[in-house]
């Protein structure tokens, strides 16, 4: 793990977390709808360390109301802690931090915004490649130290498979990053659907077809199992 990025991943927290490495405070995160991720690269050194995590479920910045279904005693309860995956993740110094996919059914392509992180102290060059459904494109990028944003468009050919509730076709996008020595330093895969979602004359449409949405509210009403 030497000379690598190291992150702590916490999948579902309720809901404010604060982290220390030994006696050094790393930071605080406060979110219900997304994992908490801490970058430990600058505070970890070879050797033994103690990670201390404090979970605070008091009603403060996030206030759903005392009788909301997420925290009231007669439904879910105001639980405290972390559930799901909790692990340390090692990443290369030049890595793919995030990918955001924008389908374009009229152009039969996807625009991919890729957030690349260069934790080296100097500028570096790399080759960014996108591949889906047998189609591939690559782009040479120059990365400054820190966070870099790269836009690229991948054409999917003349025949595309649209996504909707009756035909939930999905594509798999592979994003890879290759260094100057032709070594793949990082890669990730994301799934996406080719669909157009908009509002026309007050109606929601998917691929230009009106859709009607409905939901169900169960209120945690399962007395035998909680």
Model-predicted regions and their roles:
Residues 82, 137, 184-188:
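Extracellular and select intracellular beta-sandwich modules with Ser/Thr-enriched
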Residues 21, 109-143, 148-152:
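Beta-strand-rich binding/interaction modules
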Residues 50-53, 167-179:
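Short, aromatic- and glycine-rich surface loops/edge beta-strands on solvent-exposed regions
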Residues 1-10, 14-22, 27-28, 89-100, ...:
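Active-site-adjacent substrate/metal-binding segments within catalytic domains
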Residues 90-121:
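Surface beta-strand/loop "capping" patches
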Residues 1-95, 119-120:
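Accessory beta-strand-rich segments of carbohydrate-active enzymes
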Residues 36-42, 148-158:
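Exposed aromatic-hydrophobic patches
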Residues 12, 55, 88, 101, ...:
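Hydrophobic beta-strand positions in extracellular immunoglobulin-like domains
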């Amino acid at each position: 793990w030497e000379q690598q990025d190291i992150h702590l991943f916490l999948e579902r927290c309720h809901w404010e977390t604060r982290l220390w490495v030994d006696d050094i405070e790393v930071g605080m995160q406060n979110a219900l709808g997304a994992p908490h991720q801490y970058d430990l690269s600058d505070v970890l050194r070879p050797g033994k360390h103690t990670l201390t995590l404090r979970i605070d479920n008091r009603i403060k910045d996030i206030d759903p109301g005392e009788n909301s279904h997420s925290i009231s005693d007669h439904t879910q309860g105001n639980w405290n802690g972390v559930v799901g995956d909790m692990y340390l993740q090692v990443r290369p110094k030049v890595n793919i931090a995030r990918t955001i996919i924008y389908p374009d059914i009229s152009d039969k392509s996807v625009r991919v915004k890729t957030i690349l992180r260069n934790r080296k102290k100097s500028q570096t060059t790399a080759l960014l490649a996108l591949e889906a459904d047998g189609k591939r494109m690559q782009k040479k990028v120059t990365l400054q130290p820190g966070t870099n944003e790269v836009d690229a468009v991948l054409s999917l050919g003349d025949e595309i498979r649209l996504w909707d509730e009756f035909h939930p076709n999905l594509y798999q996008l592979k994003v890879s990053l290759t260094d100057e020595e032709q070594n793949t330093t990082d890669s990730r895969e994301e799934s996406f659907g080719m669909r157009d979602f908009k509002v026309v004359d007050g109606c929601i449409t998917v691929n230009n077809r009106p859709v009607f949405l409905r939901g169900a509210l169960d209120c945690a009403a399962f007395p035998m199992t909680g």
